[in-house]
Amino acid sequence: MKYIVVSDIHLGHIRTPTSHIINSFTKTVFTEKNKDLDVFFIAGDLFDRLLDFNSIDVREILKFLDTLLTFCTKNNIKLRVLEGTPSHDWQQPEVIVKLNELRETRCDLRYHKFLDIEYIADLNKHILYIPDEWSNCHEDIETQIKEKLQEHSISKVDVAILHGAFTYQAPIAKYAGFLYKEDYFLNLVRGYIHIGHYHTHTFFDRIVAQGSLDRMSHGEEESKGYVRVEGSNWAFVENPHAYVYRTINVVASTTINTLDKHINQLPKGSHVRLVLSKDHPLNIAFQDVKLRYLDYHVRKLNKEAISESNEITYIALSEDLEMSDSYVLDKNIHNTLKNLVLSKYQLNQTEQNKFLGYISILENLVEVEEEAI
C-alpha cells in the first residue's frame, strides 16, 4: 500500500498566512510522484481555528479543498480525514464532505470524527482512527478498540492514524496531558502508527509523528513536511517552502549592520525573534529596530545581562551571532550521548530502538519559549 500522511496544516492560522499554507501544500504535496498513491491521510488539525464564512481565508480554503478533491479523484486516491484537536478543527472538515457531495464525480472520501476501524476492501487493510481528546483514560480506549476489533473479527489492525501524543513525545510537550502507551499500540498495529498534534517530526520504533507541514511559530524552526509510505518503508518528505521563523541569538558584539546582513536575506514577511540581554543597545532601541525591518515580523525575547564569554548561556562561535533556536552548550550533545551509551552498554534491538527514539526527540528539543511583545 502506498500512502502519505499529512497533519497539522492549520488553515486559517493567525501568523502563517493561509495563502502561503495553501501554496506550500500545493507545491509540496500535489506532485507527480504522489499521483500513484492508494490513500491520502490527513491526521488532524486541517484547520487552526473556528472561521467566519465571510472571511477571505474561507474563500481560499474552499477553492483549495476543491483542488484536493480533484487531485484525489483524478488519480483514484482514497482521501481519509481525521478530526484533530477540537479547539482547532471544530468539526469544520465536514465541509469537505459537503463539497464532495456536490461534485459530478465524487472522491472516495471518509471523515472520521470518532474512534473507529475501517476496512478498505480493495487494499485488504484495516485502519484504526482515533481523534484528539477522545478519552483521558487509556483503559477506556483499549476497551473501545477491543469492541471494534471484535466487530471486524480481527485481533490487529494494519495502520493507525491518531491525533494526540505518545509517552516518548513527553519531552516536547508543552503541558502534561493524556499520553498514548507505545507498547500497547506497537502490539496492536502490524504496520506504522502515525500521529499528529505535535509539530516536530519524530519517530519511535514503528510510531511515526510526521510533524506539521509548515511552520506556525518560533520554537519549531526545524524541517517541516509529511511522511510517505511504500510497503514496509517510510520516508520523511521535506517541505522546502515552509514559512520562515528565525531565532537570532544576539551577542555583545552584534551591531545593526550585522542584523542587516542576516535579516535582509530572509524572505519578506518572515518572523524574526531576537534573543538578547536587557542591557544590549539593540534592546534599548528595540522600537527603532522594528521600524527598520517593516517588511518582517520582528519580536524579542529578553534574558538576563551576561558576558559574551559565558559559554553556559551562549553557543561559542567565531561569528558575531548564531542563528539557532537553542542555548545548549554543545549543539551536538545528542551525538555525544548516543555514542557514550551505545559504546558503554549492551542493548538489545528493542532497547536500541527506544533509546534512538528518545535521542531523536533531544535533537529537536527547544529550550527557549516564545514571548510576545
Q: Positions of the model-derived regions?
A:
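Extreme N-terminal starter segment of soluble prokaryotic enzymes
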Residues: 1-4
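Active-site metal-binding loops of divalent metal-dependent hydrolases
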Residues: 7-11, 45-47, 85-87, 130-133, ...
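Conserved beta-sheet core of the metallophosphoesterase superfamily
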Residues: 172-234
